[in-house]
Amino acid sequence: MKKALAIGLATVMAVSMSAPVFAEDEGKGIAKEDLKVGVIYIGDENEGYTAAHMKGIDEMEEKLGLDDSQIIEKTLIGEDEGCYDAAADLADQGCQIIFANSFGHETYILEAAGEYPEVQFCHATGTQAASSGLSNMHNYFTNIYEARYVSGVVAGLKLNEMIEDGTVKEDACKMGYVGAFPYAEVISGYTAFYLGAKSVCPSVTMEVKYTNSWASFELEKECADALISDGCVLISQHADTTGAPTACEAAGVPCVGYNIDMTSVAPNTALTSASMDWGVYYTYAVQCMLDGTAIDTDWCKGFAEGADKITALNDKTVAEGTEEKVKEVEDALIDGSLHVFDTSAFTVDGKELDTYKKGDTEYISDGYFHESEYGSAPAFDIAIDGITSITE
């Protein structure tokens, strides 16, 4: 498939001498052969989060029958003014739709969207598209909290096995979580993971430490080591490298990864990973360009649409009966009989929540927190009982 282009290599593809064709021209779609797609990545193929996005772009290209030359990718683009420069360069090269994959890119993508109103800008994990007033600005994410919950069930079953065989005492059943930043995206994810584990292992608690970086192998490894030293008997992560699983493999501690299958670095300890199929969105958005139809301002899909999942269970490490339980939980998520943030499943300072508002939006109704229903980005940022978050 295509090779990712670093920002310094933008000259590889010459700027088109003809005026670009846009999906909004008289409501007509773009002819497939005229389409150009730009992608801005925070990392590269060596970092799991970006690798998952690259896989999604490849999937979109294959499904829609595009050519490698129609996809221009820029890797290692930081959350700074260089992101605007990358977006402007892609627009100047004739890209009619541009994707950016990191939370901190949003300010600069908004700036570019204002400067290039005929180009569609799609930003992953962001929050400002709806309020920006820009019709060409879009946010997208997946219901990754669902996959976090399911991977938590896998972890909880492993903890039960460890309790039963005497490896862990029931009253000392503590998980550790390597978080990137104390943002709602991370809090939502680790809370869902914890609730999944707690649904099958009621005595579990969890400790969270932050690296304050989306992707740092050394910091993630150090953080996992510190959690293990604090008595955590199973580790998960919302951080983008293999640092935490590497630490777990060395220590013989079970782990649940993120973005990609971690068995290549932790064959004896990895259980599964929470993962997203970004190809579902990329295919949808680019198909909209071809059809001349509007792209959703906020897009978020989950298990039912195949947008998030857990990676293959590691038969070498998971507890007996895990596959059957996972199927049961996934089916319940898909048919709507299970809600990850069911308020009867957690307390805050010993009390069950019946209301939680952000601005004028009430997130709790019908007995659960309605995650990602009022915007694509996660909103759950509540500190619940059973989880200790260390932000130092």
Residue ranges and their predicted role:
Residues 1-29, 97:
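Gram-positive cell-envelope targeting signals
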Residues 23-392:
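A residue-level marker of the well-folded mature domains of exported/periplasmic proteins
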